[in-house]
Amino acid sequence: MAISRGAKVRIKRPESYWFNEVGTVASIDTSGIRYPVVVRFEKVNYTGIDGTDGGVNTNNFSEAELELA
């Protein structure tokens, strides 16, 4: 799989908030960690603090959980 920084990818992890959404690869860690690919999304998830418009718009995935969009 030829995933590189800046590539558009679709998320295939069923339990992810961003399942089947498209995001942009922000970075790839080559040190051997379990989820080396950081993906950035346009929308935020539901983990914002009560009363604020915020949340997380990045998450780590393994290459097996991604497909090029």
UniProtKB/Swiss-Prot annotation:
Role played: Stabilizes the interaction between PsaC and the PSI core, assists the docking of the ferredoxin to PSI and interacts with ferredoxin-NADP oxidoreductase.
Protein name: Photosystem I reaction center subunit IV
Gene3D superfamilies registered for this protein in UniProt: 2.30.30.50
Keywords for this protein: Membrane, Photosynthesis, Photosystem I, Thylakoid
Membrane-related topology note: Peripheral membrane protein
GO cellular component: photosystem I reaction center; plasma membrane-derived thylakoid membrane
Pfam family, one: PSI_PsaE
Gene name linked to the record: psaE
Family label: Belongs to the PsaE family.
Main localization (coarse): membrane
Subcellular location: Cellular thylakoid membrane
Coiled-coil regions, chain positions: none
Domain of life according to the entry: Bacteria
GO BP term (any one): photosynthesis
PANTHER family linked: PHOTOSYSTEM I REACTION CENTER SUBUNIT IV A, CHLOROPLASTIC-RELATED, PHOTOSYSTEM I SUBUNIT IV
